[in-house]
């Protein structure tokens, strides 16, 4: 459960990310593909080269979904329902991959905003990404 302090930290951190979110999403995906090569199996049609248009486009989708989630911290299941259906029923992504991507998102944000990435912000963002992952895997049953 996200505390009021967590929600405040998440909104503040996301506000500092601003227009860089799509680039950070793409960077986090590239980081995940390089660090955890098995995750590439869900993207066989992607050009995996650095900065490819497909990775950039999917990074924007990831960032947009997270921005939606930040705007609906009190009702993530409703806000992410369609995305949850897509990942559970059509894409059938292994739920473990959400944890891997979450880690790569945290690393990416820490690299770009080291002064703002305090232990409190890190903890709040980690809880937020864990909640998003839980919602995205909730319809797998």
UniProtKB/Swiss-Prot annotation:
Any one cellular-component term (Gene Ontology): haptoglobin-hemoglobin complex
Modified residues (Phosphoserine): 3, 35, 49, 102, 124, 138
Tissues expressed in: Red blood cells.
Residues that bear N6-acetyllysine: 16
GO biological process, one term: hydrogen peroxide catabolic process
Boundaries of every Globin domain copy: 1-141
Record-listed heme b binding positions: 87
Keyword line: Acetylation, Heme, Iron, Metal-binding, Oxygen transport, Phosphoprotein, Transport
Modification Phosphothreonine, positions: 108, 134, 137
Pfam families: Globin
Sites bearing N6-succinyllysine, chain numbering: 7, 11, 16, 40
Stored InterPro entries: Globin, Globin-like_sf, Globin/Proto, Hemoglobin_a-typ, Hemoglobin_oxygen_transport, Hemoglobin_pi
Highest taxon of the lineage: Eukaryota
GO MF: haptoglobin binding; heme binding; iron ion binding; organic acid binding; oxygen binding; oxygen carrier activity; peroxidase activity
Binding site for O2: 58
Modified residues (Phosphotyrosine): 24
Protein purpose: Involved in oxygen transport from the lung to the various peripheral tissues.
Family: Belongs to the globin family.
Record text on subunit structure and interactions: Heterotetramer of two alpha chains and two beta chains.
Protein name (Swiss-Prot/TrEMBL): Hemoglobin subunit alpha
């Amino acid at each position: 459960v996200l505390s009021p302090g967590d929600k405040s930290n998440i909104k503040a951190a996301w506000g500092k990310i601003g227009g860089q979110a799509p680039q950070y999403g793409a960077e986090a995906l590239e980081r995940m593909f390089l660090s955890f090569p098995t995750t590439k199996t869900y993207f066989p049609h992607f050009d995996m080269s650095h900065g490819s248009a497909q990775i950039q486009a999917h990074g924007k989708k990831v960032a947009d979904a997270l921005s939606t989630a930040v705007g609906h911290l009190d009702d993530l299941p409703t806000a992410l329902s369609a995305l949850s259906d897509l990942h559970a029923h059509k894409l059938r992504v292994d739920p473990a991959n959400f944890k891997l991507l979450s880690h790569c998102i945290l690393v990416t944000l820490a690299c770009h905003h080291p002064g703002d990435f305090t232990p409190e912000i890190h903890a709040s963002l980690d809880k937020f990404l864990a909640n998003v992952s839980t919602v995205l895997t909730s319809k797998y049953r």
